[in-house]
From Swiss-Prot:
Keywords: Glycoprotein, Membrane, Repeat, Signal, Transmembrane, Transmembrane helix. It holds the Pfam family Cys_rich_FGFR. Residues 1137-1149 are cytoplasmic. The lineage of its organism: Eukaryota, Metazoa, Ecdysozoa, Nematoda, Chromadorea. It is a single-pass type I membrane protein. Residues 1-19 form the signal peptide. GO terms for molecular function: fibroblast growth factor binding. One of its GO terms (cellular component) is Golgi membrane. Glycans are attached at residues 133, 411. The keyword S-adenosyl-L-methionine does not apply. InterPro entries: Cys-rich_GLG1_repeat, Cys-rich_GLG1_repeat_euk, GLG1. It is found in: Membrane. The chain crosses the membrane at residues 1116-1136. This is Golgi apparatus protein 1 homolog.
Length: 1149
């Protein structure tokens, strides 16, 4: 930039002769003086120069070059100065003004007062104030405009400026040609307009350290400087340094732009970052931009186009202190934007011209950071350090984006200071990129390929295009530079709700009423001293968008959710999370974690005790967000993107809902095996499943459906979902099995089942997270999980199944945790996912009509269990063995026999209802007692009577044990060694099945091969149980099935009636050979059990006689009986019909 001192005292370079010439002949024309003839001929011999007009010649000569000293001869330079003084400062100027502006002076009293100013240059200065008020086409305007051009070439001609700024000119040495007397007589260049330029240079340099850089001038001089700067900003020709520095650039970029109203300056500013622009022109434009930022009145195109709007929206500053923030261009632009968006102004929008100028000036502000004085002041260090390493202005208008990049940095050494950050935020707000992204040329240029490509169809508005860009931020089409610039802009938009025009329009009233937002958000200061809370307003709107008790309006709620869906792509676009979690991100997510995966990283760690202790605020914010995410799956951008094929095919009906309330995730869980499911989607689904398992609040439907039940029954279990599931399951179990009056609501029952199955089916991408499925169970079974290699399982249910298979070897605490799960699955078989999966085919084939909650009852039917597929049979037998351990795992038996159990087994019933035994397996309690009573019911003398339902359930338990001795724990535990020693060959012969174990034991018992007395006692017990009813001896029942149909069809079961009926038929030799043989074998066993272990026999004598007939010593016994019968016959012969009648009665008995 040119910098030459200016001398104020004309006496130093005026010659007395020239003064006398001009003074002596005041009417002589400039062209007639010999001093300038050569210069006029050289520079002004053009058709457009009127050589008869001194004004026209003066304009031509001063336009010949920036430095008149370098352009004109010494004599002509002095003569030009004399004529400028003559034209502008003596009484002839006033006379001319009265001539050309006669009408205007009559109509404007204030303007007329200017003609009474007598001090040199004061009348000129005063009249220049009214140039913009006179008609542009009139002769007065032409006169004043041409005079202004002369005055602005040398500010010594402007009297008030010289007077009021003399001290400043001296202080900054803006008035000294030769600072050293030794230079006396040396001709130093005089540069047009340089006095003001010298002052402006000092002001701009001072702007880096002073809030009000103009304050160094003092109030009087500052007023004059701003006044002159405002006037010269209106006309390109008045800004002489700019005129000469940008003369070629004006021809290059703004050839067709007419001078006046600041149009040329605006055009040059829009092209300032072009690489072909002259650097000197660019530097001067930057200085002017700073002044325009300080005083909006220098933005003439804006003030003229928007004058009605400035008045209507009350944006014109009321106090006239130029240093006030209300004079800043940023404030004016914000005020105009705010006014246009106020409901009362909706019907009268800004004119097209005003809207255009607003966009243009916003665009200039994005490109030229100097237009924001606060930015120049508060970001000077940051700009010098990071954005202008060579001390120049960063090319292509990227300074602001450079600062924006550092604003979002998490590296404390690279972050902006608080004041600079606030200044950047203010500029971004003024630019209003959300309304028109094109004001940000850097963003527009970086994202052009996407704007013209994937987002072309969204170009219905600039706002829609910007939203489209955000939707594609992680798409393959996104280019790194666009992503970077887009997220820099979104970082600030995410921290000020007013920067999103659609959100502002939809939610303005609710933001003010519900979230304490300022009604007029452009105001930096207000009477109530209320500060717009920025991110807090957005956070409030986010929470309110999912508040179903007090919801936002449909329009606002929809807009907030759509916005949050877009911004959930990055943690730093959710300020309440990023600001609270910076340390946590650094600790847990700083290595090999992509920005798009930071949320997942935080969620994987945030529920650990260590995290909660070190980062409580971060934990609280993540909890709030994850609750919203559980309610609205679209917030999980990574999952939504990875699972798009599955969602489109299987979950579209849920995805299209405004809020899916977790249905999409539930659908994805249910479709993990779908062909559209990919590894990435499955991983994201597993991730969120694990999160939701840690805290029941993260399962929206579960939380909502079970809130009252949790409050009533599970209040002391905190938020651990595993504990809540256990607690609710216990409530349901106690109601259904133990008869407790308290039960769950129907909705909670449904969601409990969903939650339980979700817990069962969760998979582990990382085995370290296995414990998250049920932390308490994992803790109490930690050793067992390692010991039996259950940690190698792929799903949680496989881990549990592994522990169930090793139940007898588990520690007490681990047993209690597994027992909890066994109980709820016994109550509702549909919650037994392992059973449902492995028996799906057999359930469909054999149990299609069975209640899903009790499908195990169907599968364990002795006629069905032998026909099941191998995998299903194995799991069914495992469940049968589990149910044999504790009567509470046989809910059907317990409910059917409740009356009998309370009558015959009161102590046992009391025990299973005691809280201290709720987690303890009570082997044989109730069942052993009921079976014992059932056995005793063989004798009528015991007066034991079982209801049909109870009798059927006890019989079922006995029959099931016939096929698997493990279902009779007392027998199996007593005979385990005998089975291993004696029956292993029999098992192998049957193909590995246990169906023949009981037959093997009975055979050994008959032969006396069982040496273990306890085992023999248990076999004898089993024989007595089977004697109660033939159905309890499946082998005998199968052998005699046809005979029972033929001879005992009408005999009711129980109390050995059918057995006695068959014995009676055997006496008559009516039975089939197979049945007779098997009955004879069983009779031997019964008699042996009776003789050795006092097994009770039926009360009927006849039945006993039939048993005796099959006794091993039956020959001698029958001999005695035959003699007795002969004796009776002899008596009958003697007594006739009396004896016959007695015989008949005996026979009937």
């Amino acid at each position: 930039m040119w910098r030459f001192p200016l001398i104020l005292a004309s006496v130093c370079w005026l010659t007395t002769a020239q003064q006398q010439n001009v003074a002596n002949d005041p009417d002589k024309k400039l062209a007639s003086f010999d001093a300038c003839k050569a210069d006029i001929h050289k520079h002004c011999s053009r058709p457009d120069v009127d050589l008869t007009s001194d004004m026209s010649i003066l304009e031509c000569l001063q336009d010949a070059g920036f430095s008149e000293t370098a352009t004109l001869s010494e004599q002509c330079e002095q003569l030009v100065w004399d004529f400028k003084v003559k034209i502008t400062q003596d009484e002839r100027f006033v006379s001319a003004a009265k001539q050309y502006c006669e009408e205007e002076l009559k109509g404007n009293a204030a303007m007329n007062l200017c003609t009474s100013q007598t001090q040199p240059g004061f009348a000129l200065s005063c009249l220049m104030e009214f140039t913009k008020n006179v008609t542009e086409t009139g002769k007065c305007h032409a006169f004043l405009a041409r005079t202004e051009r002369l005055a602005f070439s040398d500010f010594r001609l402007v009297g008030p400026f010289v007077t009021k700024c003399r001290a400043i000119l001296d202080k900054f040495k803006c008035n000294v040609l030769t600072p050293d007397p030794a230079h006396k007589g040396v001709r130093v260049a005089h540069t047009q307009g340089m006095a003001l330029e010298c002052i402006l240079d000092k002001v701009v340099k001072n702007a880096k350290t002073q809030a009000d850089a103009l304050q160094i001038l003092g109030d009087d001089c500052k007023h004059e400087v701003l006044r002159l700067a405002e006037m010269q900003a209106d006309d390109f020709h008045l800004d002489r340094p700019l005129f000469f520095a940008c003369r070629l650039d004006r021809e290059r970029y703004c050839k067709d732009v007419p001078s006046g109203e600041g149009k040329v300056f605006e055009c040059l500013m829009m092209n300032r970052n072009d690489k072909f622009m002259d650097p000197e022109c660019g530097n001067l434009l930057a200085e002017r931009a700073y002044l325009m930022g300080r005083d909006y009145r220098m933005a003439h195109p804006l003030t003229k186009a928007c004058q009605p709007e400035l008045t209507r929206y009350k944006c014109e500053p009321q106090n006239q202190i130029e240093s006030a923030a209300h004079f800043h261009l940023a404030w004016i632009l914000l005020c105009l934007e705010n006014g246009a968006n106020q409901p009362e102004h909706k019907e009268v929008q800004p004119s097209k011209e005003c809207a255009h100028e607003m966009i243009t000036h916003r665009q200039m502000m994005m490109q030229h950071f100097r237009m924001a004085p606060e930015l120049v002041l508060n970001c000077a260090q940051e700009i010098d350090k990071w954005c202008s390493p060579r001390g120049d202005i960063e090319a292509e208008g990227r300074t602001l984006h450079c600062l924006m990049e550092h604003a979002e940095s998490r590296n404390e050494t690279l972050k902006l200071g608080a004041q600079c950050l606030q200044a950047v935020q203010q500029v971004v707000k003024v630019a209003d990129i959300g309304r028109n992204y094109k004001v940000d040329k850097v963003l527009y240029g970086s994202c052009r390929s996407l704007i013209d490509g994937p987002c072309a169809q969204d170009a219905v508005s600039e706002t829609a295009t910007l939203t489209c860009l955000m939707r594609n931020v992680d798409s393959p089409d996104m280019v790194p530079e666009c992503e970077k610039r887009l997220l820099e802009v979104q970082y600030f938009m995410a921290r000020d709700w007013t920067m999103d025009p659609q959100l502002y329009e939809a939610c303005h009233q609710e933001a003010v009423s519900r979230c304490s937002a300022l009604d007029n958000w452009h105001q930096q200061h207000n009477s109530d001293n209320t500060v717009d809370r920025g991110p807090q307003v957005l956070a409030c709107l986010y929470r309110s968008a999912y508040d179903e008790q007090n919801p936002l309006s449909v329009k606002c709620g929809t807009q907030v959710r759509q916005l949050l869906h877009v911004r959930a792509v990055r943690v730093n676009l959710i300020p309440e999370i990023e600001d609270s979690c910076r340390e946590a991100l650094s600790e847990f997510c700083s290595h090999n974690v992509k920005p798009s995966e930071e949320m997942m990283c935080l969620q994987q760690n945030f529920e650990t005790d260590n995290f909660k202790r070190k980062h409580p605020q971060c934990f609280a914010e993540l909890t709030k967000f994850t609750e919203m995410e559980a309610k609205d799956t679209k917030l999980n951008r990574a999952l939504s993107k990875a699972c798009k094929p599955v969602i489109s095919t299987h979950c579209a009906q849920f995805a299209n809902e405004e809020i899916d309330h977790g249905d999409v995730l539930e659908c994805l869980v249910n479709n993990k095996d779908a062909k559209e499911m990919n590894n990435k989607c499955r991983s994201y689904v597993n991730h969120f499943e694990l999160i939701s398992l840690r805290d029941y609040h993260f399962s929206y439907k579960f939380q909502k459906a079970c809130a009252s039940d949790i409050e009533q029954s599970c209040k002391g279990h905190n938020n651990d979902k595993g504990e809540i599931i256990r607690c609710l399951s216990e409530v349901r179990f106690e109601h259904k099995v133990l008869g407790s009056p308290k039960d769950l609501t129907d909705d909670c029952k449904k969601q409990l089942k969903v939650a339980y199955l979700q817990q069962e089916q969760v998979e582990f991408d990382d085995k370290e997270h296995m414990a998250d499925a049920d932390p308490k169970l994992s803790q109490k079974c930690e050793q067992e999980i390692k010991m039996y290699k259950c940690n190698q399982a792929d799903t949680f249910e496989d881990t549990i199944e592994c522990l169930r298979l090793n139940f007898e070897h588990l520690g007490p605490e681990c047993k209690s945790m597994i027992f909890y799960r066994e109980k709820i699955e016994a109550v509702d078989n549909s919650m037994d996912d392992e059973l449902q999966k492995k028996c799906r085919y057999d359930i469909g084939k054999f149990c299609a009509n069975s209640d899903s909650e009790n499908v195990l009852e169907c599968l364990t039917n002795t006629k069905i269990v032998r026909l099941l597929q191998r995998e299903c049979k194995a799991i069914v037998k495992e469940r049968m063995q589990e149910s044999a351990r504790d009567v509470r795992l046989r809910p059907q038996l317990l409910t059917s026999c409740r009356k009998e159990a309370e009558q015959y087994c009161p102590e046992d019933m009391k025990k299973i209802n005691m809280p201290q035994y709720s987690q303890t397996v009570l082997d044989g309690v109730v069942v052993s007692c009921l079976r014992d009573k059932f056995r005793q019911s063989i004798s009528d003398q015991n007066h034991i009577d079982f209801s049909p339902r109870c009798s059927a359930e006890v019989s079922r338990a006995i029959v099931e044990a016939e096929f698997d001795p493990q279902l009779d724990p007392p027998l199996y535990n007593a005979c385990k060694s005998t089975i291993n020693d004696h029956c292993s060959a029999t098992i192998m012969e049957s193909g590995g099945h246990f169906d023949n174990v009981m037959e093997c034991l009975k055979n050994d018992f008959n032969k006396g091969l069982i040496r273990d007395k306890q085992c023999s006692e248990q076999v004898a017990r089993r024989l007595q149980e089977s004697l109660v009813d033939i159905h309890l001896d499946p082998v005998l029942h199968e052998a005699c099935a046809m005979d029972i149909q033929r001879y005992c069809r009408d005999v009711p079961p129980g109390h050995s009636r059918i057995v006695m009926c068959l014995m009676d038929s055997a006496d008559k030799q009516e039975l089939s050979k197979e049945c007779s043989t098997k009955l004879s074998d069983r009779n031997k066993l019964w008699m042996k059990a009776h003789s050795e272990f006092q097994m009770a026999l039926p009360d009927s004598w006849h039945a006993f006689a039939n048993l005796v007939m099959e006794h091993p010593e039956r020959n001698s016994i029958l001999g005695y009986l035959a003699g007795f019968i002969v004796f009776i016959l002899l008596i009958g012969c003697c007594c006739g019909r009396v004896s016959k009648k007695q015989y008949i009665e005996m026979k009937n008995r």
